[in-house]
């Protein structure tokens, strides 16, 4: 049995992860890291703690759906107690992103801004279309529930990175987030990434390629958080057998 820990167990994804780990054959829910009171029932033998180091010591793999500051603490503690890490948190600073890279030298780390198989394939398609339709303008729109705290979403930025990669560009050099006022005409290389917030939208991402006389839009819609939870569990089961290194969900899926 593979022992699994969850960081972010009291958050929006926590209940789904707990339920799915308990149901998954070959996995044992070993530890939960909590900031607040746990609102779901778990077996008595599950360790419930606010100590990141205790979670790491109890597990073969830790799944993290939390916040950047918690992920930073997790990585810092994991450097002392190397454990396979599945990271699905978004909104990292450059320093926090570097911590993931450092941790991956000592343990297997899988980081993806979105754990769904559909988004994994969409990234590949976006890069391919971007490279093929070189004269098309690229605009990305993401929609999420009113409670999401970071914008644009990590998934939208990842899609933007793949779009830029398809044209040999760096997203940081060409990204535009929002437009207002007399800003002038759109530049040739810019990639816009727009964020909409409202209601209970789980997640919707559209990458549009626009030209005179025609346009193509690639769209992915998540209708349940179970998609992300089950994707993270699939990643965890795969990751425990990997060597030290930094992986993505695409590596797990072999695409």
From Swiss-Prot:
One GO BP annotation of this record: lysine biosynthetic process via diaminopimelate
Active site (UniProt): 144 (proton donor/acceptor), 148 (proton donor)
Record PROSITE patterns: DAPB (PS01298)
SUPFAM superfamilies reported in the protein's UniProt record: Glyceraldehyde-3-phosphate dehydrogenase-like, C-terminal domain, NAD(P)-binding Rossmann-fold domains
Top-rank taxon, per record: Bacteria
UniProt feature coiled coil, ranges: none
This protein's pathway: Amino-acid biosynthesis; L-lysine biosynthesis via DAP pathway; (S)-tetrahydrodipicolinate from L-aspartate: step 4/4
Reaction equations catalysed: (S)-2,3,4,5-tetrahydrodipicolinate + NAD(+) + H2O = (2S,4S)-4-hydroxy-2,3,4,5-tetrahydrodipicolinate + NADH + H(+); (S)-2,3,4,5-tetrahydrodipicolinate + NADP(+) + H2O = (2S,4S)-4-hydroxy-2,3,4,5-tetrahydrodipicolinate + NADPH + H(+)
InterPro entries: DapB_C (IPR022663), DapB_N (IPR000846), DapB_N_CS (IPR022664), DHDPR_bac (IPR023940), NAD(P)-bd_dom_sf (IPR036291)
Compartment list: Cytoplasm
GO cellular component, one term: cytosol
Top EC class of this enzyme: oxidoreductase
Gene3D superfamilies for the chain: Dihydrodipicolinate Reductase, domain 2, NAD(P)-binding Rossmann-like Domain
Positions that bind NAD(+): 8-13, 88-90, 112-115
Keyword Ribosomal protein: no
Keywords (A to Z) from UniProt: Amino-acid biosynthesis, Cytoplasm, Diaminopimelate biosynthesis, Lysine biosynthesis, NAD, NADP, Oxidoreductase
Annotated binding of (S)-2,3,4,5-tetrahydrodipicolinate, by residue: 145, 154-155
EC number: 1.17.1.8
Family statement drawn from the similarity comment of this UniProt entry: Belongs to the DapB family.
Biological role stated in the UniProt entry: Catalyzes the conversion of 4-hydroxy-tetrahydrodipicolinate (HTPA) to tetrahydrodipicolinate.
Protein name, entry field: 4-hydroxy-tetrahydrodipicolinate reductase
Organism per entry: Sulfurovum sp. (strain NBC37-1)
Organism lineage: Bacteria, Pseudomonadati, Campylobacterota, Epsilonproteobacteria, Campylobacterales
């Amino acid at each position: 049995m593979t022992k699994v820990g969850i960081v972010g167990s009291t958050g929006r994804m926590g209940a789904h992860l707990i339920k799915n780990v308990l149901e998954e054959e070959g996995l044992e829910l070993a530890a939960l890291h909590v900031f607040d009171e746990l609102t779901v029932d778990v077996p008595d033998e599950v360790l419930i703690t606010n100590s990141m180091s205790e979670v790491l010591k109890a597990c073969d793999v830790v799944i993290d759906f939390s916040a950047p500051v918690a992920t930073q603490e997790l990585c810092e503690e994991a450097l002392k107690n190397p454990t396979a890490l599945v990271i699905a948190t978004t909104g990292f600073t450059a320093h926090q992103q570097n911590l993931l890279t450092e941790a991956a030298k000592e343990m297997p780390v899988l980081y993806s801004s979105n754990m769904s198989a559909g988004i994994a394939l969409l990234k590949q398609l976006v890069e391919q279309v971007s490279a093929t339709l070189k004269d098309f303008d690229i605009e990305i729109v993401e929609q999420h529930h009113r409670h999401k705290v970071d914008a644009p979403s990590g998934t939208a930025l990842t899609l933007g990175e793949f779009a830029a990669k398809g044209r040999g560009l760096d997203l940081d050099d060409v990204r535009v987030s929002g437009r207002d006022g007399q800003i002038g005409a759109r530049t040739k290389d810019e990639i816009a990434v727009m964020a909409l917030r409202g209601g209970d939208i789980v997640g919707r991402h559209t990458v549009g390629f626009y030209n005179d006389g025609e346009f193509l839009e690639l769209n992915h819609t998540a209708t349940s958080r179970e998609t992300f939870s089950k994707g993270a569990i699939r990643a965890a089961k795969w990751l425990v057998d990997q060597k030290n290194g930094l992986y993505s969900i695409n590596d797990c899926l072999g695409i």
